[in-house]
Amino acid sequence: MNHAPHLYFAWQQLVEKSQLMLRLATEEQWDELIASEMAYVNAVQEIAHLTEEVAPSTTMQEQLRPMLRLILDNESKVKQLLQIRMDELAKLVGQSSVQKSVLSAYGDQGGFVLAPQDNFS
């Protein structure tokens, strides 16, 4: 059985999933990106299974090489965008912790605003 057409199609599908993930990351659609990750992983596993059964010919490898480069480039860009997002979230968590500390330190004042007394009388 010739797996070459099926393998090539599987790689094309992986490229499409990779491009979708890059678009979602670029558009900061983080929930959708996470949701699409499982389909990407499944596509990678399918390719691994297909290449385990029958190793692709040298000609097929040459045809697949540009797709692999594109997928790796997309993955690198997605990782960069995710790192930027993680840095943003870390900053927000840090700010939230500071606010919580301030509220904890000054929030037990019984609802009163403390002001210096005027002792000039």
UniProtKB/Swiss-Prot annotation:
Compartmental location: Cytoplasm, Cytosol
Residue ranges of the region described as FliD binding: 60-98
The keyword Transcription appears for this protein: yes
One Pfam family per UniProt: FliT
Keywords: Bacterial flagellum biogenesis, Chaperone, Cytoplasm, Repressor, Transcription, Transcription regulation
Required for homodimerization: annotated segments: 1-50
GO cellular component entries: cytosol
Leader sequence segment: none
Subunit details: Homodimer. Interacts with FliD and FlhC.
Family: Belongs to the FliT family.
Function: Dual-function protein that regulates the transcription of class 2 flagellar operons and that also acts as an export chaperone for the filament-capping protein FliD. As a transcriptional regulator, acts as an anti-FlhDC factor; it directly binds FlhC, thus inhibiting the binding of the FlhC/FlhD complex to class 2 promoters, resulting in decreased expression of class 2 flagellar operons. As a chaperone, effects FliD transition to the membrane by preventing its premature polymerization, and by directing it to the export apparatus.
Protein name: Flagellar protein FliT
Gene for this chain: fliT
